[in-house]
Amino acid sequence: MHIHLINPNSTASMTAQALESALLVKHAHTHVSASNPTDTPASIEGGADEAMSVPGMLAEIRQGEAQGVDAYVIACFDDPGLHAAREVAKGPVIGICQAAVQVAMTISRRFSVITTLPRSVPIIEDLVSDYGAERHCRKVRAIDLPVLALEEDPQRAERLLLKEIEIAKAEDGAEAIVLGCAGMSSLCDRLQKATGVPVIDGVTAAVKMAEALLGAGYATSKVNTYAYPRIKAAAGHKVCA
């Protein structure tokens, strides 16, 4: 099976980090590749960044469809363009937020999410509600660190995350922690060992979920909601399924 990971932002080093996390957990017979658009924001921090990232991400999926990709992972915790991506792809499309939340609800009764900036908190709160986890998610927290700073100063990021995890355990009663940014994936194992609480990385969760769905023979339903887009002209261009 071939799983393609798409980082919707244009920072190639972040794409490489997410791919490294995926390669560590994939099945021996699974092929995982990765890419990112080159004309999208360097990081996705808010609704405007999300909107600007979606056309490039959909183009990556269309290219993957032509190459025979079986499933896709959208490696941004805001799950930008997830529903649109499922319209374009034949196989499963997994958002890392949805995957991480599903894992958290499966292995714990209550969990907290820790993300980068405070402006991302309401976006993630809405996603948690959409995914049916509002009763289980005790709090969405932020370490007030920009996404790109996770790579620029990983030691500081780790210190801030460790502190916030301990607060979440004490104040939220969190039994598991979800890392709310793909750029945190490389820190997951160390954070779990240091805090003694399950720490869930969405990239890992999404790759394993994609493998499970493909192994069971599931594809994206093309009945109504996720049917292929109708072909039509748009500003002189043809919108292709």
From Swiss-Prot:
Annotated positions for site Seems to be responsible for recognition and proton retrieval of D-isomers: 76
Parts of the chain that traverse the membrane: none
The keyword Isomerase appears for this protein: yes
InterPro entries reported for this sequence: Asp/Glu/hydantoin_racemase, Asp/Glu_race, Hydantoin_racemase-like, Iso_Racemase_Enz_sf
Domain of life: Bacteria
Keywords: Amino-acid biosynthesis, Isomerase
Regulation: Inhibited by Cu(2+), Hg(2+), Pb(2+) and Zn(2+). The activity is twofold lower in the presence of Mn(2+), Co(2+) and Ni(2+). The insignificant effect of the metal chelating agent EDTA on the hydantoin racemase activity would indicate that it is not a metalloenzyme.
Effect seen on changing residue 76 to A: The secondary and the tertiary structure are not significantly affected
Pfam families in UniProt: Asp_Glu_race
Temperature-related behavior of activity: The activity is gradually lost at temperatures of more than 30 degrees Celsius.
A single GO BP: amino acid biosynthetic process
PANTHER family: PROTEIN DCG1
Family assignment from sequence similarity: Belongs to the HyuE racemase family.
Name of the protein described by the UniProt record: Hydantoin racemase
Gene that this sequence comes from: hyuA
